[in-house]
Amino acid sequence: MKKYNKLIINNLKCSFRNNIFIYFLFVVLILLSCIYLKNGVMHGKSVGAGDYYFNIIKGVEKIDSNNKLKEIPFIYLGFAIFISYITGQILENECNKIFIIYAGTRKKWILSKITVIFINIVFMYMTAAIICFMSGKRKITFNSELFEKYFGTDYFIQNNENKFLYILVFFAAPIIASFAISMVQTVFSLAVKNMAGFIISMIIYIISIFDINIFLPGNGCMAQRSSLFMENGLSVSQVIIIDIIIIVITLIIQLKIISVKDIL
């Protein structure tokens, strides 16, 4: 167990070292989002941490009858690109051969990679939340005017009593959904090549924009798609369950692929 823990730590060190510039760009994206919301939208008015964070994970509410976007979800797509890139980089970096030898078995090697991918995803969402918390002067509040005029939803204002639902919609669902997509990406990266996995991952994220469907994991990354913000929105519990099923199935496939694939 100690050897496996060291393997995880070494993987994390290698991942953070290789992706330091990507993390920097990610932080810049979050900061620019907060600055734009504060000065470009609210013109200096009070904005709470909840508003900042929702602006980051909201995605798009729905597509009109002609399948036209009312807005381009830049931050959602930014998350998609950063997470997909880091996932691919973790699977294919210069430390791999050392880690394979250190792991001793292929199963431990792939499990260590999956663990590091999950930790990176959690790290990115938590970093975004912390930046928003500090930007909102540590006040976790929501501005009703902002939701009605800018975010385009007033349903939330009338249906926001379930505090546990906040945790599911704002944190659990996006993290699990992103991880489910990364697991699909890993399957294609192992079976074909790294670029194929990245392309598949981005396709899933993009298709999810145009279809409100619990079977498309990208919907879990967009808070506005949930029943908390849409009258006929998706059930967050169903979204999480489907994503967990995807994770389990892809894990089984990965273990099967890795058992016969030459990874050296």
Regions found by a protein language model. Give the residues of each.
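Central hydrophobic cores of alpha-helical transmembrane segments
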Residues: 25-29, 193-209
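Extracellular/periplasmic helix-loop-helix junctions in multi-pass membrane proteins
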Residues: 198, 211-238
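Aromatic- and glycine-rich beta-strand/loop motifs that create alpha-glucan
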Residues: 1-27
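Secretory targeting signals
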Residues: 30-86, 111-190, 225-243
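Junction motif at the cytosolic side of a transmembrane helix
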Residues: 11, 245-264
